[in-house]
Amino acid sequence: MEGVELKEEWQDEDFPIPLPEDDSIEADTLDGTDPDRQPGSLEVNGNKVRKKLMAPDISLTLDPGEDSLWSDDLDEAGEVDLEGLDTPSENSDEFEWEDDLPKPKTTEVIRKGSITEYTATEEKGDGRRWRMFRIGEQDHRVDMKAIEPYKKVISHGGYYGDGLNAIVVFAVCFMPESGQPNYRYLMDNLFKYVIGTLELLVAENYMIIYLNGATTRRKMPSLGWLRRCYQQIDRRLRKNLKSLIIVHPSWFIRTLLAVTRPFISSKFSQKIRYVFNLAELAELVPMEYVGIPECIKQYEEEKFKKRQKRVDQELNGKQEPPKSEQ
């Protein structure tokens, strides 16, 4: 093969063995005296030819040029002692590379399909994030971290009467605002949390105190969400619901219930009762363990001041003496 001019057209039959992928190919010369080196394309017939190879002008080539996929930089990076590198926990969540490649974070190094090793703290924290609730015959996972600011929406208010007749308090002022980007995700997890908690709290008959005061329209749950809650409640819980007391009902709530009354069963409609202040509520249920949010108390105080001011103005207007005619 001496004197034969090499062209850029390479044939597969000229390579009886696979080209080396892990070892570097010398760019300047092919040294045939190295016993550890794989035979190249010019040593097929046993002839040792020392000829300089020119890298083809293409982006993906097997020659070790500057634009080659198998460059010296990558070969040197592949020979790094992995055991000598610092682990992410020892190196502030970053790997140190010896070349000019960007330094990825640990989340970028972990690829799909790899197994993430948790520390004891992370494992404990992840266990707290998710909680299983049994609704009907199925188990549902709830993202407890996502709904953490809204868990006060439902609480246990003690018992009433004889036996384990539970008082369940539902405070709408703790609902998320509808303008949040993850609103649907929050409401879905909050729905499971409310239904699952309700089944845990209720043993026999129960009542729901619906605190509607101090709630903006953006925090009001939709009618579909409330209807879904009622439909997902177990039949036993729907039957054992003895009363739904709506405290500080707004005009919107009363109008909504009036419009939907034809579509609600008469038995459920008879369970609804409006209460306009906390004093009236205290006459119906024991308030010892009923947690009233501070915003509800402030809301009632402001309403009382406005009402008192209006009454005073009316009384002062009646007490003014009539003007004498001139």
UniProtKB/Swiss-Prot annotation:
InterPro entries: Bcl2-/adenovirus-E1B, CRAL-TRIO_dom, CRAL-TRIO_dom_sf. GO terms for biological process: apoptotic process; blastocyst development; centrosome cycle; positive regulation of MAPK cascade; positive regulation of neuron differentiation; positive regulation of small GTPase mediated signal transduction; response to oxygen-glucose deprivation; striated muscle cell differentiation. Residues 147-304 form the CRAL-TRIO domain. The modification Phosphothreonine is found at residue 87. It is found in: Cytoplasm; Cytoplasm, Perinuclear region. Its main location: cytoplasm. Residues 10-33 have a biased composition (Acidic residues). It holds the Pfam family CRAL_TRIO_2. GO terms for cellular component: centriole; cytoplasm; cytosol; intracellular membrane-bounded organelle; nuclear envelope; nucleolus; perinuclear region of cytoplasm; spindle pole centrosome. Residues 1-47 are annotated as: Disordered. PROSITE patterns: CRAL_TRIO (PS50191). SMART domains: SEC14 (SM00516). It comes from the Eukaryota. SUPFAM superfamilies: CRAL/TRIO domain. The modification Phosphoserine is found at residues 41, 89, 92, 114. Keywords: Apoptosis, Cytoplasm, Phosphoprotein. Implicated in the suppression of cell death. Interacts with the BCL-2 and adenovirus E1B 19 kDa proteins. PANTHER family: BCL2_ADENOVIRUS E1B 19 KDA PROTEIN-INTERACTING PROTEIN 2 (PTHR12112:SF12), BNIP - RELATED (PTHR12112). This is BCL2/adenovirus E1B 19 kDa protein-interacting protein 2. It comes from Mus musculus.
